[in-house]
Amino acid sequence: MSDQDNIFERLSKILRSRKETSEDNSYTSQLYKEGIEKIIAKIKEESEELIEASTSDKEAIIHEAADLVFHVMVLLAFKDIDPSDILKELERREGVSGIEEKSKR
């Protein structure tokens, strides 16, 4: 398994540790201290930046998508949700029509 295959797991461990041991010089610890509203605001901000970057070059899109994924992972750690739960949900949806899946909610 390559390092890329484990990035979500490794990042999740780091984010959980930042939640448990608040470090003054840690951006993530600061987000946790400021709470859910700040985390949500960052996700909104990063979503908007990704939308803006969508008309730019590939590198800008990759950069902004990584920022958004990072902040979503901060939210998951804040809410004690493991990224593997998201992957399981995506696997559950695999091969199911989006229209069909949405109608089951």
For each feature predicted by the language model, list its residue ranges:
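Flexible "arm" and connector segments at domain edges
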Residues: M1-A65, V69-R105
